[in-house]
Design a protein with these regions (language model features):
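Cleavable N-terminal export/targeting peptides
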Residues: 1-31
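Repeated loop/turn-to-beta-strand initiation elements of outer-membrane beta-barrel proteins
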Residues: 36, 62-69, 95-99, 135-141
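Transmembrane beta-barrel strands of outer-membrane/channel proteins
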Residues: 38-44, 71-75, 102-108, 141-145
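Outer-membrane beta-barrel architecture
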Residues: 39, 55-59, 86-88, 128, ...
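Solvent-exposed loop/turn segments connecting transmembrane beta-strands
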Residues: 42-53, 73-85, 113-114, 118-120, ...
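Residue-level signature of outer-membrane beta-barrel architecture
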Residues: 58-62, 89-93, 131, 145, ...
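Mid-length scaffold segments of soluble, non-membrane domains
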Residues: 74-105
Length: 169
């Protein structure tokens, strides 16, 4: 996988703006619901399952147009750590309690006994599909890609498949 989800996150937001009636404040700051999520799953390096990861993420409650601000941190069993900040775009069904999210984040990677990702600056982008249980929370399946976007000579990246539970604050 490459930066496809990063591009989709931006394009989905721009498409949302183009079909909504938001002018002249399409990128205005807004308050949105805050959420905390915790997820766990498998880490893949060049299609091989190499590790397990736990990931904690917070949606801050601040949005600029269709993009919601988010930050998070993850740790693997092999003592690799990542922490970053970015944006997510969410689409929710009006007729069923289902949703999809795309996210794009930049952050710092500290290598333990895990894979060499080329350097400390790493970008994380991905997609999540889930079910919204209302006031009791949400359950989703996520897939994301982490790499340095070619700023270092080594740029193989990691993929993560996780089960995520989130709840509102």
């Amino acid at each position: 996988m490459d930066g496809t989800f990063a591009v989709l996150t931006l394009l989905a937001g721009f498409a949302d703006i183009s079909i909504s009636d938001c002018k002249p404040n399409c990128y205005a700051e807004a308050q949105v619901p805050q959420r905390i999520s915790i997820s766990a799953g498998q880490v893949y390096y060049q299609l091989d399952q190499v590790d397990t990861e736990v990931y904690l993420r917070k949606q801050t409650g601040l949005a600029f147009g269709p993009w919601r601000m988010v930050y998070g941190a993850s740790a693997t069993q092999r003592r690799d750590y990542w922490a970053g900040v970015g944006v997510l775009y969410e689409a929710a069904s009006k007729t069923a309690p289902i949703f999809a999210q795309l996210h794009l984040m930049s952050g710092l990677y500290a290598r333990g006994a895990g894979e060499d990702l080329g350097g400390p600056i790493e970008f994380r982008s991905g997609i999540e599909f889930g079910y919204d249980f209302g006031s009791t929370g949400r359950l989703g399946v996520s897939y994301d890609h982490r790499s340095n976007a070619g700023i270092y000579a080594t740029n193989f990246g990691l993929e993560t498949v996780q089960l995520r539970y989130s709840w509102g604050l």
